[in-house]
């Protein structure tokens, strides 16, 4: 007889949206700061004199362009995590209403996060870095839609399996 912790899954959708927003903002700012730093280093003649230095700085720039794909990977990881925890955490169908209310609150909060993303990326400092993040920009602008879809997938997975009294399934 295996017992799992019965917490989780309801708030996971909201936490995923908040963490995704945090990662997106952090990566965008990191890209902006590091790109400006590398450009400044490349224009300084005492730093960019050797070929290995130029290659190393080019490697930093190449790594920064991969941060966009990392946000997509984080989104996929959160989706898979919510599906897995929804399957492993048993839920009585009577609690579906509470889960639905939490999804609605998560969509409202994710709308605020999407609007905050749009406002933050409209600043002159971050606009140049935004062109390197097309996937992240799409995900963040459509975050309420993603949260809705992920939330309903969580409902189907958590409450769609047969319920057996006593917590055993």
Predicted regions and their residues:
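Glycine-centered recognition micro-motifs in short, flexible terminal segments and loops
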Residues: 1-19
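Long, compositionally biased, intrinsically disordered regions
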Residues: 15-169
């Amino acid at each position: 007889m295996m017992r799992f912790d019965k917490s989780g899954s309801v708030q996971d959708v909201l936490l995923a949206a908040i963490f995704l927003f945090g990662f997106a903002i952090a990566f965008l700012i990191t890209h902006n700061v590091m790109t400006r730093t590398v450009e400044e280093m490349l224009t300084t003649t005492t730093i960019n004199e050797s070929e290995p230095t130029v290659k190393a700085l080019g490697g930093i720039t190449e790594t920064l362009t991969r941060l966009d794909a990392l946000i997509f990977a984080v989104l996929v990881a959160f989706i898979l995590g919510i599906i897995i925890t929804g399957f492993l955490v048993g839920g009585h169908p009577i609690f579906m209403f509470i889960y639905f209310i939490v999804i609605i609150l998560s969509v409202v909060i994710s709308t605020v996060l999407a609007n905050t993303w749009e406002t933050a990326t409209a600043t002159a400092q971050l606009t140049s870095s935004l062109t390197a993040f097309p996937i992240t920009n799409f995900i963040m602008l459509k975050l309420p839609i993603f949260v809705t879809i992920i939330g309903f997938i969580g409902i189907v997975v958590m409450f769609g399996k047969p319920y057996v009294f006593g917590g055993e399934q």
